[in-house]
Amino acid sequence: MADIRDAMMERLLDDAGIREGMRVLDVGCAFGALTFLVAKRVGRTGHVVGLDRDPQLLSLARTKAREQGLSNVTFIEADLANVPAEQGLFDAATGRRVLMYQPDAVAALRGIARAVKPGGLIVFQENDASIGPVSLPPLPLHIRVSEWIWHTVDREGADLHMGFHLAPAMEQAGLSVEHVRAEASLQTPKEHHAMGPILRAMLPRIVRYGIATEEEMGIDTIDARLLEERSKANTTYLGEMVFGAWARKP
């Protein structure tokens, strides 16, 4: 089954106009998940530069790129607000769940815009905790999992409402916003988004902040238990809203 959130991102890239032959900067790329989506879209005549501050994540991204046989990607260690000048100017910049972690999202967007050509695209997707979790009837385990994740993100100083703040931040950064949207991250008994890998990746942080213990989470069985809870209730679960927007550099 295709990843629900990747499908949202693919639609956003499509509608924004990320296309074959483009040279794209993917900021806060981590291990390259979005970088690879963009790389497949721009094709052999295009190129994607993934940028992150974490050398361990970048090493993992390079390994994954080799495993996927992608020759049109490069990964560099740098701060997203200060893209090295030697990289030149890009046709577009992309990011996913990145601005929410910036102490000043407007300043970060201004720095990113400096690396984009005049008229170039800046495309971002940001999650937002303002709405959700919601289901009828309520699903206690789903609510707990959502709290584990969002309480951890909150303790790390992230903006839990970056989705709603996305378009205004782009405008304040001097960009011309062309479109903003919000889609619900939904799960049903038949549509499933795996939470186990997310919790496993966040495990050290969740435990460190005292939000939950490893035993309490039961990561190895969490996805089966979530699916069982939804199936027994035969209901749709709205986890959170996912905002997307694109703008152009004047």
Positions of PLM-derived features:
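C-terminal helical/coil "lid" or tail adjacent to the Rossmann-like core of SAM-dependent
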Residues: 2, 178-237
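A short acidic, Gly/Pro-enriched loop at the edge of an enzyme's catalytic core
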Residues: 82-92
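Conserved catalytic/acceptor-binding region of the Class I
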Residues: 123-192
